[in-house]
């Protein structure tokens, strides 16, 4: 009897051991090889799967090597920004894949397939599973949602970004841009010139714009929150770049503790501002409360709740509103600052376009304060900004995940496969833009984006489809205001000390700053 019991225990133990051995082998080997076979049978090419590492080690090595030396101003930025993608496409062709650990990441470069991926957001979603608890302290708000929760949140936030609401933010844009121009004015003698690292000041500008537009009269408090968010961003990037060890982010390390402390302080500070706003709104002064983005967001949230029969679950909670404020800081600052700095660098290299842009600003505004109607008529500056976004795409690639087995065009995509859409490759593709693709030619956008891309939908610096960046118009409006004030006061050129070294720090930034010679007009 005792022997039989021991035999049963032994058999159960062996069975469980074999089961878990199989599960582990399936996870680390059989499943990746099955996915690889499926892709190869459809004509996709890539390196053979390697246990655990995939292509990540080699990709990281290529990126580190690319960042060791700058490039010439006329050289292709892709070899510094996406050397790993260039190597994959160069070796295996456009129809290729890379390995991210045990997951294949397929390159999608066909504009029609990209439109399908970005339009069918319910099938192809963000890879949230790669985010650990610490990283999620930063990546919050609508960007972290999918499906119905995303649709509900987007409806509320869309109302806050309506162009009539954006008009209300124009004075904040002007004040922040004026402050930066005044700062430069004090550095440059009358009728003279001076070298300025404009990148540092542009970062400060876009941070101030976020603080002013988000919190209005609580601007100084907003500045403190911005500094905290900037520190949290730097720490998060450090986490993303480090080797992932399961459970490591739960450990009470100095970095983890600091990130949690920042998150707690940011939440407390934003909550205090929200409570002040809510108190004003409840006192019947809703109009005075809705003079900044936070007030507008709270107003839109209350309106949505009322429209749904005072159903509070139809709106956002205080915690969710805090998440949107954090996302606004994180996403709203980087894109505009990189757009502005590369615009100034390119206009330094092409003075004829700088002159055309300046003439347009004086023609539209003279010496008056730029207004919404005038900014909407800045055709030359719009062309220039689009061309800068094409050549120096803020985010080089987008990645989605097939959360279920699905058909993409003529291809079958198994569940779990990642789809990478390298915008920068499409934006630099001579088959789409012509042989002059790497030249700075804003005139290619003279008749709009559709005409420039031959209606192919191959220009998407702010993504495409229902999940297109909600802050696109905000960023462009801010950039036009800034360039209008800069061009009226200064001409500029590259300094001899300028070092051309674009690199990716979430967005494409100048690794060693942007040293320009400013000439006071």
Curated annotation (Swiss-Prot):
Q: How does it sit in the membrane?
A: Single-pass membrane protein
Expression tissues: Mostly present in actively growing aerial organs, including leaves, flower buds and stems, and, to a lower extent, in mature leaves, roots and opened flowers. Expressed in the leaf internal phloem-associated parenchyma (IPAP) inside the mesophyll.
Enzymatic reactions: 7-deoxyloganate + reduced [NADPH--hemoprotein reductase] + O2 = loganate + oxidized [NADPH--hemoprotein reductase] + H2O + H(+)
Q: What induces it?
A: By jasmonic acid (MeJA).
Binding sites annotated in the UniProt record for heme: 469
State one molecular function term (GO): iron ion binding
Q: What is its main location?
A: endoplasmic reticulum
Glycan attachment sites: 107, 311
Give GO terms for biological process.
indole alkaloid metabolic process; response to jasmonic acid
Q: What is this enzyme's EC?
A: 1.14.14.85
Q: Which residues form the signal peptide?
A: none
SUPFAM superfamilies the record matches? Cytochrome P450
Q: Give the record's keywords alphabetically.
A: Endoplasmic reticulum, Glycoprotein, Heme, Iron, Membrane, Metal-binding, Monooxygenase, Oxidoreductase, Transmembrane, Transmembrane helix
What biological function has been recorded for the protein in this entry?
Component of the seco-iridoid and derivatives monoterpenoid indole alkaloids (MIAs, e.g. vincristine, quinine, and strychnine) biosynthesis pathway. Catalyzes the conversion of 7-deoxyloganic acid into loganic acid. Not active on 7-deoxyloganetic acid.
| Protein family according to the UniProt entry | Belongs to the cytochrome P450 family.
What name appears for this protein in its UniProt entry?
7-deoxyloganic acid hydroxylase
Q: Which organism is it from?
A: Catharanthus roseus (Madagascar periwinkle)
Give the organism's phylogenetic lineage.
Answer: Eukaryota, Viridiplantae, Streptophyta, Embryophyta, Tracheophyta
């Amino acid at each position: 009897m005792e022997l039989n019991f021991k035999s049963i225990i032994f058999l159960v133990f062996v069975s469980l051991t074999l089961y878990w051995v199989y599960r582990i082998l399936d996870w680390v080997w059989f499943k990746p090889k099955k996915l690889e076979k499926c892709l190869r049978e459809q004509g996709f090419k890539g390196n053979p799967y390697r246990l655990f590492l995939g292509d990540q080690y080699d990709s990281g090595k290529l990126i580190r090597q690319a960042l060791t030396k700058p490039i010439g101003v006329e050289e292709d930025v892709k070899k510094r920004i996406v050397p790993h993608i260039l190597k994959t496409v160069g070796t295996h062709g456009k129809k290729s894949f890379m390995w991210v650990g045990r997951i294949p990441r397929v390159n999608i470069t066909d504009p029609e397939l990209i439109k399908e991926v970005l339009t069918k957001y319910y099938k192809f979603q963000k890879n949230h599973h790669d985010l650990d608890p610490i990283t999620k302290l930063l990546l919050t708000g609508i960007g972290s949602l999918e499906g119905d929760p995303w649709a509900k949140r987007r409806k509320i936030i869309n109302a806050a970004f309506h162009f009539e609401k954006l008009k209300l933010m124009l004075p904040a844009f002007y004040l922040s841009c004026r402050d930066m121009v005044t700062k430069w004015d004090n550095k440059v003698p009358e009728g003279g010139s001076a070298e300025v690292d404009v990148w540092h000041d542009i970062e400060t500008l876009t941070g101030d714009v976020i603080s002013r537009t988000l919190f209005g009269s609580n601007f100084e408090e907003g500045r403190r929150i911005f500094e905290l968010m900037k520190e949290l961003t730097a720490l998060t990037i450090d986490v993303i770049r480090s080797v992932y060890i399961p459970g490591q982010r739960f450990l009470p390390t100095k970095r983890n503790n600091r990130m949690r402390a920042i998150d707690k302080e940011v939440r407390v500070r934003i909550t205090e501002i929200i409570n002040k706003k809510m108190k004003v709104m409840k006192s019947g002064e809703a109009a005075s409360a809705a003079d900044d983005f936070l007030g507008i967001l709270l107003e839109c949230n209350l309106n949505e709740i009322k429209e749904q029969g005072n159903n509070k679950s139809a709106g956002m909670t205080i915690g969710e509103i805090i998440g949107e404020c954090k996302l606004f800081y994180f996403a709203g600052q980087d894109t505009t600052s990189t757009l502005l700095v590369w615009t100034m660098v390119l206009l330094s290299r092409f003075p004829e376009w700088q002159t055309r842009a300046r003439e347009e600003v004086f023609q539209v505004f003279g010496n008056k304060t730029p207004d919404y109607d005038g900014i909407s008529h800045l055709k030359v500056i719009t062309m220039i900004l689009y061309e800068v976004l094409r050549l120096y795409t803020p985010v080089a690639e987008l990645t989605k995940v097939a959360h279920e087995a699905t058909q993409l065009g003529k291809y079958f995509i198994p569940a779990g496969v990642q789809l990478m859409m390298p915008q920068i490759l499409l934006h630099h593709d001579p088959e789409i833009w012509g042989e002059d693709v790497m030249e700075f030619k804003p005139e290619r956008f003279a008749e709009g984006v559709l005409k420039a891309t031959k209606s192919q939908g191959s220009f998407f610096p702010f993504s495409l489809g229902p999940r297109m960046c909600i802050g696109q118009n905000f960023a462009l409006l801010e950039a036009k205001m800034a360039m209008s004030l800069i061009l009226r006061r200064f001409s500029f050129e590259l300094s001899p000390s300028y070092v051309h070294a674009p690199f990716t720090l979430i967005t494409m930034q100048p690794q060693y700053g942007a040293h320009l010679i400013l000439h006071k007009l």
